[in-house]
Amino acid sequence: MKFLDEAKVYIRSGDGGAGCVSFRREKFIEFGGPDGGDGGRGGDVWAECVEGLNTLIDYRYQQHFKAKKGEHGSGRNRAGAKGADVVLKVPAGTEILAEDRETQIADLTQVGQRVLLARGGNGGFGNAYFTTSTNRAPRHANPGQEGREHWLWLRLKLIADAGLVGLPNAGKSTFLATVTAAKPKIADYPFTTLHPGLGVVRVDAREFVLADIPGLIEGAHEGVGLGDRFLAHVERCRVLLHLVDGTSEDAGAAYQLVRTELDAYGHGLAEKPEIVALSKADILDPETLAAQVARLEEAAGRPPLVLSAATRQGVPEALRALMAAMDAASAEEAKPAEAWQP
């Protein structure tokens, strides 16, 4: 299935049905009076978070969504039927933004959540509504109200327990393929991964979701290399596994570049718990490995893990470190807020 994490859609709720001008006409009833019914309300436009979706690809091929109009009223005080609603089905983690792409309308993170995007127009009153003591036979009715229309942006931020970050070709996709059943594209060139991938990791009878975030480059927070869209997926991750390519010229500089981008993007990315690991250890000679570990330890301020996804060296330790970091984050989130002290 193709992946799409952003889409622009046009929505319009249904117009209300018109009220009816009608008079009661029955045998032996000389002055039947008005009996025009009200128009039906127009259909609404909703967004609903559903299970089984992980992309917005459906909205590449259909961008316009219009709810049905309400039916007109009719004689014998019969009101028109309400117009049919339209429901935009989206995956968990979808943000709905106004046309300016900044004003958040809704953030759907749980299956079953629904939000009303545009309410249908009210139906018009039939002539029976306008009967008064001085006007016993009104000959006018209201038209229905027009529906509302908007252009909206849908933006998907994948929900995962942990995220893999690093420069292009750092071995993130290989790691994901090693520890999960996911089958990402793997090749020996940068930007092999062009969209985020998800996999389920099983460790000691426990499970968590791991996201492979495409490689970040300098200027990613400003949109270089679609980096701002990739960084948006990191927002939902509770813990980060930062992979640094052991074959790079300077592992410390590579680490700092990604940390700079996380900090510049904001949204709390730089404050997330982070596990640092040097990857591709299997193809480094002992002297080079020791030098890269020293550079990375100096840049990160703590000893990094050393791993190789190809040989599984250090992989179990990395997964258990991620699990421990997630447990610590959960314990921190569960702490009650401290009472305010004047």
Swiss-Prot record:
Top enzyme category: hydrolase
InterPro entries referenced in this protein's UniProt entry, alphabetically: G_OBG (IPR031167), GTP-bd (IPR006073), GTP-bd_Obg/CgtA (IPR014100), GTP1-OBG_CS (IPR006074), GTP1_OBG_dom (IPR006169), GTP1_OBG_dom_sf (IPR036726), OBG_GTPase (IPR045086), P-loop_NTPase (IPR027417)
Domain OBG-type G: 160-327
Cited CDD domains: Obg
Cofactor: Mg(2+)
Localization in the cell: Cytoplasm
A Pfam family that the UniProt record links to this protein: GTP1_OBG
Keyword tags: Cytoplasm, GTP-binding, Hydrolase, Magnesium, Metal-binding, Nucleotide-binding
GO MF, one example: GTPase activity
Enzyme Commission designation: 3.6.5.-
GO biological process assignments: ribosome biogenesis
PANTHER family noted in UniProt: DEVELOPMENTALLY REGULATED GTP-BINDING PROTEIN-RELATED, MITOCHONDRIAL RIBOSOME-ASSOCIATED GTPASE 2
Stated family: Belongs to the TRAFAC class OBG-HflX-like GTPase superfamily. OBG GTPase family.
Described function: An essential GTPase which binds GTP, GDP and possibly (p)ppGpp with moderate affinity, with high nucleotide exchange rates and a fairly low GTP hydrolysis rate. Plays a role in control of the cell cycle, stress response, ribosome biogenesis and in those bacteria that undergo differentiation, in morphogenesis control.
Record protein name field: GTPase Obg
Lineage: Bacteria, Pseudomonadati, Pseudomonadota, Alphaproteobacteria, Hyphomicrobiales
